[in-house]
Design a protein with these regions (language model features):
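Anionic N-terminal interaction surfaces
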Residues: 2-66
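Non-membrane alpha-helical secondary structure
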Residues: 15-22, 71, 136-139, 143
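Alpha-helical oligomerization segments
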Residues: 149-154
Length: 155
């Protein structure tokens, strides 16, 4: 990685090369777990939860590959290196799922059994606190707003 790549990683959270590699990994992971995976739009999303104990603040980080298409959302929990991969969760009308978007909680998907709140990430500067817990990826503002519009519209 040259100087440009190093600077880009520091300010954007990922070099273009690293981001493209991670997007390809995400697609491969998704397609292995989801039938007709290429028919879904993929986004990397994350969530953070905070607990304030008496002496220490605890932050829990979660990473997700989220695929969406008309009438369905699939969520796959992953780690920041895309090596520890969870099961896929499918949400649609058939299993009484709901999707929502709000400026305060970002994207929500859930049914009677499980739910997720997450934020689609545009970029995360590597110099920000907690960036080492997130997938190194750059997603465009348009990609993020398209996902937000999808979640606002609901199923």
């Amino acid at each position: 990685m040259g100087l440009k790549g190093i600077l880009q990683k520091a300010f954007m959270g990922a070099s273009t090369e690293e981001s493209n590699e991670n997007k390809e990994k995400m697609r491969q992971i998704f397609n292995r777990q989801v039938e007709n995976g290429n028919s879904y739009t993929l986004m990397y999303c994350y969530a953070e939860s905070y607990t304030n104990a008496i002496l220490v603040e605890i932050t829990k980080h979660a990473n997700f590959i989220v695929g969406y298409k008309e009438g369905e959302v699939v969520v796959i929990p992953v780690d920041a290196d895309l090596t520890d991969i969870g099961d896929s969760y499918i949400f649609n009308k058939a299993n009484n799922s709901q999707i929502k978007y709000s400026a305060f909680t970002s994207c929500f998907v859930g049914n009677d059994e499980i739910s997720f709140n997450f934020i689609p990430m545009e970029y995360r500067p590597a110099i920000n606190r907690g960036s080492e817990y997130k997938v190194a990826i750059i997603q465009s503002h348009k990609e993020v707003t398209d996902m937000q519009k999808f979640f606002k519209a609901g199923f």
